[in-house]
Amino acid sequence: MEGMDVDLDAELMQKFSCLGTTDKDVLIGEFQRLLGFQLSPAGCAFFLDMTNWNLQAAIGAYYDFESPNINVPSMSFVEDVTIGEGESIPPDTQFTKTWRIQNTGTEVWPPGVCLKYVGGDQFGHVNMVMVRSLEPQEIADVSVQMCSPSTAGMYQGQWRMCTATGLYYGDVIWVILSVEVGGLLGVTQQLSSFETEFNTQPHRKVEGNFNPFASPQKNRQPDENNLKDPGGSELGTISKNTWGPAPDQIEQDQNGLSQNSVNLSPSSHSNNLSVVTYSKGFHGPYPFGQS
């Protein structure tokens, strides 16, 4: 009988130890936090259920059973290289967060690792981004597309590296965001993207004597002075240094119009301009009759 009392007392003590934290979600979250987010929620639930949802016993079981068999990768957070880091951002604005990380271990990372959201504010719908397997001591930048909350204030969230099997490793990466109506982070990143796009576009080769404000004739080569029609006949010659009557102008009709040439010679201009002379006459029909 006394043995039964001892067993009942032990069972009651076990139940009393779990009375303060009967919410399974709370226990799972606390289990994750104490392990430094090294185990997925499903893994935490497994150890808690195995120990009758006793948090202390579950942690002991995890270290006794899992730790000797786990080869955890290593990762160190190097720096935040986000464009405009430290600036506030307007509400409901897209932005990109970029972190520099390093594999500080002695082995290459396993395939399928990712940077995953683990707590706090998420900033958009993206909760993970795939990361390539880094060699030992290799450094890489990881970017995540985010969106600021719709209400002004201070926000924070946590991200961690995670293996394909759900094992978290490395430093916790914090996102601390100041949301203000007059924030400039979104504009800063847009201007930076425009500058990057402009610098990556191919540039045209411009000659030293090229004048962007001159007429097309000014930038042509000397051998482009003679103009010919598609049939090969010469239409005219561009004269650069003369402004006067065309040499082949022979006669004018009674109305002062020439049938054989067109001559432009306004007396009000004293500078040298180009003159186009048409050496071939126009041949009927004549809309006003032939003089």
Swiss-Prot record:
Can you provide one Gene Ontology molecular function annotated for this UniProt record? Answer: ubiquitin binding
CDD domains tied to this protein:
NBR1_like (cd14947), UBA_CF106 (cd14349)
Where does this protein chiefly localize?
Answer: cytoplasm
Question: Could you give one GO CC term from the UniProt record?
Answer: nuclear speck
Q: Where in the cell is it found?
A: Cytoplasm; Nucleus
Q: Which domain of life is it from?
A: Eukaryota
Q: Which InterPro entries match?
A: C6orf106_UBA-like, Ig-like_fold, N_BRCA1_central, UBA-like_sf
Q: Example GO biological process term?
A: innate immune response
Carries keyword Nucleus? yes
Q: Which Pfam families match?
A: N_BRCA1_IG, UBA_4
Q: Composition bias, kind Low complexity: at what positions?
A: 257-275
Assigned keywords, A-Z: Cytoplasm, Immunity, Innate immunity, Nucleus
* Region described as Disordered: spans on this chain: 199-275
| Known function | May have a roles as negative regulator of innate antiviral response.
Protein name stated in the entry? Protein ILRUN
State the gene name recorded for this protein: ILRUN
